[in-house]
Amino acid sequence: MKQTLLSLSNLTKQFDGKKVLDSLDLDIFDGEFITLLGPSGCGKTTLLRMMAGFEHPDDGTIALGDQDLTHTPPEHRPLNTVFQNYALFPHMSVFDNVAYGLKMEKRPKQEIRERVEDALAMVQLEDFARRKPHQLSGGQQQRVAIARAVVKRPKVLLLDEPLSALDYKLRRTMQVELKRLQRELGITFVFVTHDQEEALSMSDRVVVLKDGLIQQLGTPREVYERPANLFTARFVGETNFFPGRVDKANGDDTITVDVFGLKRTFRKPDFPVSGGQSLHVLLRPEDIRVLAPDDEDGVAGKIVERNYKGSTLDSVIHLEDGTEVLASEFFDEDDPTFDYRLGEPVKVSWVDGWEWLLPTEPEALPEEEGTDA
């Protein structure tokens, strides 16, 4: 049984009359890596700042175990924050940056030295203690910021998009390092990002936010493979949306659905369905199978774009009714026919059971612009 460490209850916040958080409830477990994921303006940064104490809710409470933190100043909360710009003191050495918080608490010199050395060892920077921040790479600066945060032994570490300034390769490396560090420390990590790949690869659970409301809370696999609504399906990864119409409900917890004129048998979804009902059939690009044009199975179309990415071949296919299909297939270097020409006719199919069904309720696309909140 997982134990709740940080409890957020009915949190509400408005800026200039607009609700940024709307009666939000969230329990964060002891020792988990949880990510707040969403587009700009969804409320994820405001929520993190509330946990840290830099913002106060208009309504609701924040509790750490039995301790009410709602109005506790940031410096008195057993939570530390790693900011996007790291906020290192440029005139101080790595050692002094990490030791700063302990010195402010007037800890004994011996204790400070031991704890700083331990923290630097955790982030593999013990040989860099005398360097200044400008002598470090971006990844090393980030690790110093993490060491400075964990040296005070917080119960929760809050990370506000700490990887966004790093290049792609270093960002991938630091994703692995952060997860390793979190496991070794056993500290609860609350991570904020708009990057779906980061959220899926690092988290124990993901909170998908939109307009100050939780759209879905679950494991990365649940969020990706079984999105709760159209917003989550669109925002987390790429998705093909096929129009389906229920032909009939079968007697074995399955339904027959007409998709592009094909009768496919699907598992009955969690929402009520009846004959003639329209619904969305969701398939990720990696679920799509591209077949030869004379194959008996599948829907006819043609290749309009292809991108070789080393391990995968990504294709865009236009079906005869104009529907655009994204397909991502693992590249088979032993198959000389595994490639496509632009304009080449193909058929599109998938394995029954790989699809996910959602009702055809109207849902706005995620906004790409706006000030993050």
UniProtKB/Swiss-Prot annotation:
Residues bound to ATP: 38-45
An example molecular function term from Gene Ontology annotations: ABC-type putrescine transporter activity
GO CC aspect terms: ATP-binding cassette (ABC) transporter complex
Residue pairs linked by disulfide bridges in the UniProt entry: none
SUPFAM superfamilies with a match to the protein in the record: MOP-like (SSF50331), P-loop containing nucleoside triphosphate hydrolases (SSF52540)
Main localization of the protein described in the UniProt heading: membrane
Keyword presence, Cell inner membrane: yes
Membrane disposition: Peripheral membrane protein
EC numbers: 7.6.2.11
Catalytic reaction(s) noted: ATP + H2O + polyamine-[polyamine-binding protein]Side 1 = ADP + phosphate + polyamineSide 2 + [polyamine-binding protein]Side 1
Domain ABC transporter: 6-236
Record bears the keyword tRNA processing: no
Swiss-Prot/TrEMBL keywords: ATP-binding, Cell inner membrane, Cell membrane, Membrane, Nucleotide-binding, Translocase, Transport
Compartments where located: Cell inner membrane
Membrane-spanning parts: none
Subunit structure: The complex is composed of two ATP-binding proteins (PotA), two transmembrane proteins (PotB and PotC) and a solute-binding protein (PotD).
PANTHER family named among the record's database cross-references: SPERMIDINE/PUTRESCINE IMPORT ATP-BINDING PROTEIN POTA (PTHR42781), SPERMIDINE_PUTRESCINE IMPORT ATP-BINDING PROTEIN POTA (PTHR42781:SF4)
Family: Belongs to the ABC transporter superfamily. Spermidine/putrescine importer (TC 3.A.1.11.1) family.
Purpose: Part of the ABC transporter complex PotABCD involved in spermidine/putrescine import. Responsible for energy coupling to the transport system.
Protein name stated in the entry: Spermidine/putrescine import ATP-binding protein PotA
Organism: Marinobacter nauticus (strain ATCC 700491 / DSM 11845 / VT8)
Gene (name only): potA
